[in-house]
């Protein structure tokens, strides 16, 4: 079950907004597409790249920055360079058959991920989430070695170049493993929840909303899946909308839209009536 929030544009001549909280229950014809999120913030060993001697690193927990002290001096000479985060990761044999991702909520400024000594991928930019799929690269039933190399040195092709703030280096937000079934709501669309809400019309009479759901089918077979949306006002279910979808083989990050309408919606007013819908 996934939650995603969004809000509408303003009503004409009004600051009232409709604030929707939706959750989509996604079930394939094979098995339930539940996902597991496993925090990966602890047991990291950190060292700078110039610290090459054995035992030179020290344990840290995420979120972490190597500029926690020097960047507060008010001077522009705080450390900007490469930091390395490493840890072991035991992957149970029972995880075979699932898709496994590692998701970073943020690391500054560029990040390279290595698994068991092999380069998995790079992310450039310090202010957005990113994700890598590890499914076919893990050793199951054994310990795997993760290395995350983060660089906050100035790089002319990575924005911003200047600012009235410090470019704190490190993995400064949470990291987690994500386990899904083969057919799932895709986490690969810029590391988003894979669900986007678009309000196309909102007034006192009705709110027209479209839920765009990004779906993955990495298998070699066409899959028939069902996507369901249920909207609640308080504890009362007011909308149940579902759609049967045929996913072609090897279809990745494919958008499917489920429209629904809320009649006479309870409009959101942040200062006087902060009502929300939920699923």
Model regions and ranges:
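Secreted/periplasmic carbohydrate-active enzymes, especially glycoside hydrolases
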Residues: 1-12, 16-21, 25, 31-279
């Amino acid at each position: 079950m996934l939650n995603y929030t969004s809000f509408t544009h303003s009503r004409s001549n009004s600051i009232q907004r409709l604030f929707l909280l939706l959750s989509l229950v996604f079930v394939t014809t094979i098995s339930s597409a539940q996902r597991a999120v496993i925090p990966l913030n602890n047991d990291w060993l950190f060292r700078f790249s110039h610290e090459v001697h054995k035992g030179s690193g020290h344990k840290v927990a995420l979120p972490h920055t190597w500029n926690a002290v020097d960047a507060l001096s008010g001077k522009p000479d705080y450390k900007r360079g490469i930091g390395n985060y490493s840890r072991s990761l035991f992957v149970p044999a029972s995880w075979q058959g699932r898709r496994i991702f590692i998701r970073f909520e943020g690391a500054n400024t560029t990040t390279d991920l290595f698994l068991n000594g092999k380069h998995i991928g790079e992310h450039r930019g310090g202010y957005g989430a990113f994700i890598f799929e590890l499914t076919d690269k893990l050793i199951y039933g054994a310990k795997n070695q993760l290395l995350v190399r983060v660089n906050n040195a100035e790089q002319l092709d990575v924005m911003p170049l200047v600012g009235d703030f410090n470019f704190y280096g490190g993995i400064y937000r949470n990291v987690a493993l994500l386990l899904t079934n083969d057919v799932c709501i895709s986490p690969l669309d810029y590391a988003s929840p894979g669900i986007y809400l678009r309000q196309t019309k909102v007034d006192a009479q009705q709110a027209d909303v479209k839920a765009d759901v990004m779906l993955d089918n990495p298998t070699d077979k066409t899959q028939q899946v069902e996507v369901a949306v249920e909207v609640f006002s308080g504890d009362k279910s007011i909308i149940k909308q579902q759609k049967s979808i045929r996913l072609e083989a090897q279809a990745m990050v494919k958008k499917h839209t489920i429209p629904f309408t809320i009649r006479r919606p309870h409009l959101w007013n942040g200062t006087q009536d902060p009502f929300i819908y939920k699923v």
